From Swiss-Prot:
Lineage of the organism: Eukaryota, Fungi, Dikarya, Ascomycota, Pezizomycotina
CBM1 domain sequence ranges: 19-54
Ranges where the record places region Disordered: 76-97
PROSITE patterns, alphabetized: CBM1_1 (PS00562), CBM1_2 (PS51164), GLYCOSYL_HYDROL_F6_1 (PS00655), GLYCOSYL_HYDROL_F6_2 (PS00656)
Domain notes: Has a modular structure: a carbohydrate-binding module (CBM) at the N-terminus, a linker rich in threonines, and a C-terminal exocellobiohydrolase catalytic module. The genes for catalytic modules and CBMs seem to have evolved separately and have been linked by gene fusion.
Protein name per the record: Probable 1,4-beta-D-glucan cellobiohydrolase C
Amino acid sequence: MHYPLSLALAFLPFGIQAQQTLWGQCGGQGYSGATSCVAGATCATVNEYYAQCTPAAGTSSATTLKTTTSSTTAAVTTTTTTQSPTGSASPTTTASASGNPFSGYQLYVNPYYSSEVASLAIPSLTGSLSSLQAAATAAAKVPSFVWLDTAAKVPTMGDYLADIQSQNAAGANPPIAGQFVVYDLPDRDCAALASNGEYSIADNGVEHYKSYIDSIREILVQYSDVHTLLVIEPDSLANLVTNLNVAKCANAESAYLECTNYALTQLNLPNVAMYLDAGHAGWLGWPANQQPAADLFASVYKNASSPAAVRGLATNVANYNAWTISSCPSYTQGNSVCDEQQYINAIAPLLQAQGFDAHFIVDTGRNGKQPTGQQAWGDWCNVINTGFGERPTTDTGDALVDAFVWVKPGGESDGTSDSSATRYDAHCGYSDALQPAPEAGTWFQAYFVQLLTNANPAF
């Protein structure tokens, strides 16, 4: 999976040696290349695996990326008449009782992503790219989910919910809702390498994860008057459907189920609506995978005592599939269920038959250009010929789908193309992956430019 940049950048001086280009790697565990940057760039430590050359002028403060545009919000379009029943706008109403939990709210604009665009992207849009500055500014204002991909990021949830609470108290109309991704399972990303997490099952990872969830719950209880939308553990359950032949996934199965159960039961709060990640059409939409996937999702839901706050499933997270497409691209390899609408309408009845009346959200953050440049449907890393997609809205035209959302912040890398890196995944070196690419979660300027250029609708 693919996860966002660390909370802030720490700037470290290095000795005089060969210089790395802007956005290139300049440090990290196991790295042996150039450790200084060209003029106008500064080497910024992102995490233990990666340091990146970023524009010096836009990153002089280690707190810039955390604080810029923290009060910005954007409304969610709610003009459709084909939705699930619209419920009360009260942030303390249980999601399952109030219908579509997105209706009647505007979504909080991810302040960290907004400041990445302002501090990293826009200063580099010069010369022939200067015409994209207005589009970049607009993209920064589109609400996207905040990823809680390490325990260290959990306190920022409190900062953001406090800001939302303050704006709502000041009369925000419609009231603002927060959006977060819960993403820190032990032995995370078990079928890939690019987004390995901080916890290991062998090193008390399950207990560490439960503490992580406890911290999130504490914040949600503290801000019980703020309506909060959660996506739960991208890729995790989908890996248990198709990848148990991978030793790491087989070994992680019981821990994934225990941890997911803990998350669903502990975060089952009146001000919360949760969506379990459900892969995408190119993963679980295959006819042979639909019933096993439905069986697993229904089992997880029922084993958690059918939590009222679990509204349904999230699809296409960090992926590229069309919501609907008239002709299946060649890379869908003969599967007639080749878009997210078909996938959702195929799996929903299978869930309903087992007592899980699931509704859905779809990540449209990077699916604006169709077909994409994928050579194979399973190619997921920094895929070429992609663009920003439909803006967040409840106007989906399908009663099963609560909203189109931007879960993956567009412009943050899916994984490094450096084959010598500790977390290198071969998918990031494929011919349909934009290269050279930095580590997962770090800013990838060329990819952001691609998304802007191919945005549909355009900014």
